[in-house]
Amino acid sequence: MLAQHLPVVVIGAGPVGLSAAVQLLDRGLDVLVLEAADDVGASQRDWGHVRLFSPWRYNVDKAAARHLEASGWVPPPPDDMPTGLELQQRYLLPLANLPLLSGRIRRNRRVTAITRVGVDKTRSAGRGDVPFLVRTHEEDILARAVIDASGTWWTPNPLGAAGISARGEAALAHRIHYGIPDVLGAHRERYAGKTTLVVGAGHSAANSLLPLVELASATPGTKVVWATRSADLTRVFGGGEADGLPARGRLGSALRELVDSGALQLVQHFRIDSLREVAGKLEVAGLRDGAPHVVRGVDAIIAATGQRPDLGMDRELRLGVDPALESVLALAPLIDPNVHSCGSVRPHGAVELAHPEPDFYIIGSKSYGRAPTFLLATGYEQARSVAAMIAGDREAALRVELDLPETGVCSSTRSAPAQDAGGGCCAPAKSACC
């Protein structure tokens, strides 16, 4: 069965998935975008109250912008920093509604498996000539190529220090928020007058801790406990006034001041093992500095512990995945968070993103696996390069067209006036993770 007349299937209608669709359409290829949620940009909507650290100029794909502007779209001020909701409503929704894309996006289509027609993972002969079969709950779709841009937002890391859920975590999931809740807005009542344990040592944790302390100053009985696996908080505190990104420096400095002032209780070097409910309160147990330790009297937990990729849908394909990071294999030495910040990751494209499975690519944050060093501008460059490679334009695929400022861009901070926005997701210098 010849596959060349079939569409390229893009999984995920977030910023990078829609960018890939535009790039493919610009090259004359048929495209079908499958989105598990009820609309595009569902992840951005979920953290809609959080303000990106990077300005609009680095959050809009250039190819997409050309089509939008041709339709009369007025771009937001390039140096303003959007919230997640603004990114969805002012960019992703207008993009998805363009005639170019509107009929090619299928919402509420969760992909459950990807394979080859009539061919399982073990068969090699003629494998690359057989179309892909992309299965959703509603239908099977045949494709000439598949781009997985489904992201990692919906698969957060658990609280357990060993990389698995802590004992009791699943049963108490209704007391845990994974990610960044809207503490001063939609989720205020959940935390007002309560004791909240925030787990994590990155900027997602900072973006929960700062509003929680603000809430505590206005609402009696509100208490904040911050638990970190590491004893070193340098990454989240940052460089202060010496930070190349001033707003990120302000965020870290504000958090450091809160810790120094005693406005929150800090539990460092704490490795969580179990959770249980006692008389309506949570007890969180584990090891602190190698000795048993229990945090008691907790009403709610915020798990700001990062994300990991869900590779379940891809398991019948021949993947090249790093055993530690679960990133695309060739990217691992480039993005290892033990070595690199976002800014030190060199530009890469279709060659690095290729798998042993021909014409299958993972792009966007999922391509980085568990590494927190992904930036949105890099995702757009990935999409451009992969689209060129699928279209047979290897020369264009090998070109580097990524343009970032000297100090880099980063995300994110909770919603605030744009000039006061700050945050970040990875350590030194130019960094971003949106």
Residue ranges of each PLM-predicted region?
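N-terminal Rossmann-like FAD-binding beta1-loop-alpha1 element of flavoenzymes
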Residues: 6-33, 202-215
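Residues at the starts of beta-strands that form the adenosine-phosphate
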Residues: 7, 30, 195, 220-223, ...
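A Rossmann-like FAD-binding core segment of flavoenzymes
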Residues: 113, 213-322, 388, 394-406
